[in-house]
């Protein structure tokens, strides 16, 4: 069993790194702590590095079409880590989850239609809706401080959720599961309630589950499409190795759509963009990550939990009160 050194400090400045170099270009101090972007300062797993080295040494980076090994790595990962049995034909590749969100908005709504989100949420949700001339409708999450427990909790206002769907004739809901940035890991019961409402009103759900592998002990990620077979029929599930394995710059994501009609509509929008084959090295890294990255991820999550516990204790001492969340958003 390999032991990974997450204490190693790697200087990313001056490497065209968006996280650090962008801040300096915008006039921020050179020593600024860039907490605004979700990539990590850890090197990737040995399995990924070795696979990329082999691909680079081959010396040709032509058009790429992943085969069975790629799809098997992904489906096996989903079954092992998320108790979700999937099929190869459900998987559609895009260069990123935000790209997929845009394709879904165009595939399943028309200009002027309303799209439902749950603020406070990852800001590209709003941008991608407005940039495609759709209307943003907000089912704002309800925030509750539990002072005696030193915790905070966001919850869903289901009455408002259904009311907005009816009043605004919602056709598409973009779910963030787990929720970024509030860190809620939605329970099966919460997702069941959302799903029943969407089923009742024929609302398509696009579930952004890119943070599905970052859940703290005591919590369990539930794939929305796996809550109920009926929900799978109207769900687009967005996943990627980018957050889990620190691969954002390799531009690859895997979108699961079990309903053939939805899949064809989504593919039509992808075709309109001219996107076809994935990034050659991105495909290699994705397969390697899902095939052999479990040990690295297990050690990473333990390390991140130690960081969280340190930060919690430090802020509790200095600020006297701290509210924590379920996931590492």
Can you say where each PLM-predicted feature lies in the sequence?
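N-terminal small-domain helix-loop-helix segment of the aminotransferase-like
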Residues: 2-96, 289-292
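PLP-dependent aminotransferase class I/II
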Residues: 234-316
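Hydrophobic "anchor" residues on beta-strands that sit immediately upstream
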Residues: 114, 172, 204-205, 236
């Amino acid at each position: 069993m390999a032991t990974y050194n997450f204490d190693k400090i790697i200087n990313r400045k001056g490497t065209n790194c968006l996280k650090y170099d962008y801040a300096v270009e915008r006039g921020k101090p050179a020593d600024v702590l860039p907490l605004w972007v979700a990539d990590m300062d850890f090197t990737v797993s040995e399995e990924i590095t070795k696979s990329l080295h082999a691909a680079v040494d081959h010396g040709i980076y032509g058009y790429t079409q992943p085969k069975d090994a790629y799809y098997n790595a992904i489906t096996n990962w989903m079954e092992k880590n998320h108790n979700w049995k999937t099929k190869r034909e459900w998987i559609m590749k895009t260069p990123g989850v935000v790209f997929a969100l845009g394709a879904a908005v165009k595939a399943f709504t028309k200009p002027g239609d309303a799209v439902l989100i749950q603020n406070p949420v990852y800001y590209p949700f709003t941008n991608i809706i407005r940039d495609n001339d759709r209307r943003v409708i907000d089912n704002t999450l309800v925030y509750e401080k539990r002072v005696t427990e030193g915790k905070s909790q966001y919850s869903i206002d289901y009455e408002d959720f259904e009311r907005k769907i009816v009043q605004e004739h919602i056709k598409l809901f973009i779910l963030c599961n787990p929720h970024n940035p509030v860190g809620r890991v939605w329970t099966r019961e919460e997702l069941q309630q959302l799903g029943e409402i969407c089923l009742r009103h024929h609302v398509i759900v696009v579930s952004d589950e890119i943070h599905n592998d970052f859940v703290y002990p005591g919590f369990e990620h539930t794939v929305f499409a796996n809550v109920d077979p009926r929900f799978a029929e109207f769900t687009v599930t967005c996943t990627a190795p980018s957050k889990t394995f620190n691969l954002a710059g390799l531009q690859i994501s895997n979108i699961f759509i079990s309903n053939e009609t939805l899949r064809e509509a989504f593919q039509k929008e992808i075709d309109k963009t001219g996107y076809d084959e994935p990034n050659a090295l991105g495909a290699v890294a994705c397969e390697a990550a899902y095939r052999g990255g479990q040990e690295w991820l297990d050690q990473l999550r333990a390390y991140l939990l130690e960081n969280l516990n340190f930060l919690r204790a430090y802020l509790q001492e200095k600020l006297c009160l701290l509210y924590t969340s379920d996931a590492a958003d």
